[in-house]
Amino acid sequence: MKTNKKRLCVALLTCAAAAMFAMRAQGSAADEIKRLAALMQWKPGTIAADIGAGDGQFTFAAVEHLGAEGKIYATEIDTKKLEELKAEVTKRKLQNVVVVESKEADTNLPTACCDAIFLRRVYHHLTKPVEFDANLVRSLKPGGRLAIIDFPPRAGLDPVEGVPANRGGHGIPQRIVIEELTAAGLKVEKVVNDWPENDYCVLFVKK
C-alpha cells in the first residue's frame, strides 16, 4: 500500500512539474513574441512567417498579436512536427495559420507574401544558407523585415551536421549572420544583444 502511495505521489509531482514547465514555456514565448512584435512593427493585417516552427509555441503566441486580421505561415521540415502542427491548428480552429512544409534550401512560401519573417534558433541549422537566404528575401514584401534570433557557438553542444564550417560549432557568430544576409540583399536595421536566454536578434529590412 505504501509503495502504491509513493508511486502515486511521484506521478503527481511529475505531472505538476511538467505542467509548470509548459506554463513557463508558454509565458516565455508570449513575452518574447511581444518584444519581437514591437521590434518588427507588427500591426493589424500583418502577414508573418515562423520559419522552423517546431512545436508551434511561437507561432501560436504570434497569432495573439496578429489578431484575426493578420496571418502567419508556420514552416517546418520535419514530417512528424508538420502533422502535429496541423493537428494543433485544427484543434484550435485557427483560420489564419497556414502550415507549410519547407525544404532544405526552400521555404516553400509564396513570393512577396510576408511583411515579417522570423527564425528563432533555426538559422544555425541551415545546411544551404545561400539558397535559403535567397528564398527568404524572395518571400518578403518590399519594406518587409526579417529577424534572426540565434546564439554564438556554445561549448558542450554537439556540432550540427552538414552546416558550413564557418559556424564554428553549435550556434553561429553574429557577424556571419550579418555577412550572409546582407550578401543576399537585405539591410541591417537593428542589432539586439540582450535577447532572452543569452541569444541575440538581428533585424534586417528588404529595400
Region locations from a protein language model:
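Core SAM-dependent methyltransferase catalytic element
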Residues: 189-207
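A short SAM/SAH-binding and catalytic strip from SAM-dependent methyltransferases
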Residues: 113-130
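Conserved class I S-adenosyl-L-methionine
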Residues: 44-54, 82, 145-176
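A short glycine-rich, Lys/Arg-flanked "PGG" loop and its adjoining helix->strand segment in the class I
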Residues: 63-64, 130-145
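Conserved alpha-helix/loop element of class I SAM-dependent methyltransferases that forms part
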Residues: 28-46
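A short acidic, Gly/Pro-enriched loop at the edge of an enzyme's catalytic core
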Residues: 43-46, 107-117
